[in-house]
Amino acid sequence: MASAGKPALDDSRRGTGSPKIKGRENAKDTLCRNITIYGRCRYEDKGCAFNHDPHKVNSSNQSDSKKRFNVDSPSFTPSLLSSNGSSPTSTPATTKKMTTISPKAANAAPFQPRSVVSRSNASTPGLRQDTVTPDWTVAEVQEFVPQGFDNSHLAALQGNGNGPITSTSPFDPFVTTPTPLSAGGAVGPVQPNPYSHDAAAALGGAAFFPGAAGFQQPVQYHLYAPIGPHNQNTLGYQRNVHDLFLPNDFREELQKKAAATLQTLPNTQLPAQIDYFHSLVPLDLNHQKNATIFGFPSWVYKAQSSKDGNYYALRRLEGFRLTNEKAIRSVQAWKRVCNGSVVTVHDAFTSRSFQDSSLIFVTDYHPLSKTLAEQHLGAGQQRFQGRHNVQHIPEQILWGYMTQIANALKAIHSNGLAARVIDASKILLTGKNRIRLNACAIMDVVQFDSQRTVADLQRQDLVNFGQLIVTLGANSPTVMHNPTKAMEHFTRAYSPQLKNSVFWLLNGMQKDQDRNIDVFITGISSQLMSTFDSALHLDDQLTSDLSRELENGRLVRLMAKLNFVNERPEYEHDRQWSENGERYFLKIFRDYVFHQVDAQGDPVVDLGHVITCLNKLDAGTEEKITLISRDEQSCFIVSYKELKKALESSFQALMKPARRMH
């Protein structure tokens, strides 16, 4: 068997011998190198054997490739199939037969790949189906076109160590193709979003990594962000100096409150210290004793605490003697009342610092606050006004007072307490139409032995509430001496809704129906929404005013750092602190910012120029400026980026321990 197979092997080896080295018989199909290098060949007409037509070479290559790879060639069909993986027995006859192709192969179907097999075919691999149509063809598959990916970012994305790059999201706002995989249109690289602080979002979602992996761009602190509301009639490019600071009226109000808080009274006859309070300043405008409300003369002082350094209001009841220790403990329940319409009570104690037995209540201090009696029922206003010149309080302001008092009573009654003192002389006006109930806990101590129930006292609060509104509406503290006439006057001045609400409060002691503060709040819910909307507008205004001062603190710190470095006399002869280098730039930069003069030599006081230069210095922009020395003999062109670097290095050198010990 072995000897019979040798002649076939020898024939096959002789048929596939190594090719001989040929000469230049195929030079006519090779493009001349002179054409490739110089574009022409000087020996083309002098016997150059190579081809000088590039188009002819390309066409010949294409025809050659067609000869080598032709999809129309018949598919390969083996002559003998092995069964169960066993190799057939080789014979000389069969060997010669296997080296040839049957003539029937010319009529065979063209070869088509079957890389995808249906589930039905995969479940029965042993069955052979001769007439099976392919499940899919190459033409049905759409060409893959990547979206939102730029090759320039490939190295940066692979360097994050987050594994392979995931596919981009089909919902890309920067890609205008209608489908996520479009074979017809080509998609260019995605333009980065310049307003995004996320590296992945800047690429339009191409790099879908977590935001923490990307570099977070710093906030542009040198830009002032004008937060609304905006009610000015200026153009978009116009800015006022007042846009960068608080409004003048608001600033003056805050400064006056700060001055009133820090006010002291020298050479006073008041005690130097009461318990842990000192620096007493009287707050009463009327020096006459009045015991109408509490049954004892009361005085109000401002004092500073030795414990926390804050300022508090001390209300003193003159001549009060405590007979029951449980009475003063009732103040502990008022400490739990935390409401914006109630003055917070902090402590209560007795003292003999005024050479008598006094009861002291410690509450929050609101500087420059007035009472409603001083604001609307002042004696000076009523003395010189005739009957027809009385200015009624606007109804919207009265509704604002009612909603705030209702809010205070809601908090007090929810804690099982009663205000018991709802009087115009004991309600503080701490801001524009902003009121707070005051002196609420005093009656619980003074009248501790009272037999009235809490429910009865809460209904009495409703009656006192209604009487207060009628008194304010009539602008007269004695109007309730004649209730019928007072209500007739109130009805003529205000709307039926306000009148009905006041009538309901005045009938609070009647037990014909359930009368409490919750029922009253339900009845005035529409006005509560109006007051709430006004509070939201005020919050927006305060936020806008606060945003103006947001960047000014940063500029102050920058100016302080600049002045720390410039012209230090103790380092004048220190070579390491010479002003010939980068510190000299900072010195003449200060002259550029603050010491400019006009053409006539007059000083230029331009706040906008100062703020602009400091903001550019803090941002470290690439903008270049011209700095001229004081003797006008030297001129330097530097950028804000270089100035910022010089300022930081100089300040760090100043902060070194060796420098501070020098």
UniProtKB/Swiss-Prot annotation:
Spans of biased composition, class Polar residues? 115-133
Q: Where is this region: Pseudokinase domain?
A: 263-525
Residue stretches spanning the membrane? none
Could you tell me which Pfam families the record lists for this protein?
Answer: Pan3_PK (PF18101)
Which portions of the sequence form the region Knob domain?
565-662
Q: Where is the composition biased (Low complexity)?
A: 75-102
Q: Mark the C3H1-type zinc finger spans by residue number.
A: 26-55
Q: Which UniProt keywords apply?
A: ATP-binding, Coiled coil, Cytoplasm, Metal-binding, mRNA processing, Nucleotide-binding, Zinc, Zinc-finger
Q: Which residues form a coiled coil?
A: 526-564
Reading the lineage from the top rank, the first entry is: Eukaryota
Tell me, what is one Gene Ontology molecular-function annotation carried by this entry? poly(A) binding
Q: Where is this region: Disordered?
A: 1-29, 53-133
* One GO cellular component, as annotated: P-body
Q: List positions binding ATP.
A: R315, D364, Y365, H366, P367, L368, S369, K370, T371, S425, K426
Q: What does this protein do?
A: Regulatory subunit of the poly(A)-nuclease (PAN) deadenylation complex, one of two cytoplasmic mRNA deadenylases involved in mRNA turnover. PAN specifically shortens poly(A) tails of RNA and the activity is stimulated by poly(A)-binding protein pab1. PAN deadenylation is followed by rapid degradation of the shortened mRNA tails by the CCR4-NOT complex. Deadenylated mRNAs are then degraded by two alternative mechanisms, namely exosome-mediated 3'-5' exonucleolytic degradation, or deadenylation-dependent mRNA decaping and subsequent 5'-3' exonucleolytic degradation by xrn1.
Q: What is known of its domains?
A: The N-terminal zinc finger binds to poly(A) RNA.
HAMAP family found in the cross-reference section: PAN3
UniProt lists the family membership as follows: Belongs to the protein kinase superfamily. PAN3 family.
The UniProt subunit note reads as follows: Homodimer. Forms a heterotrimer with a catalytic subunit pan2 to form the poly(A)-nuclease (PAN) deadenylation complex. Interacts (via PAM-2 motif) with poly(A)-binding protein pab1 (via PABC domain), conferring substrate specificity of the enzyme complex.
Name of protein? PAN2-PAN3 deadenylation complex subunit PAN3
Q: Gene symbol?
A: pan3
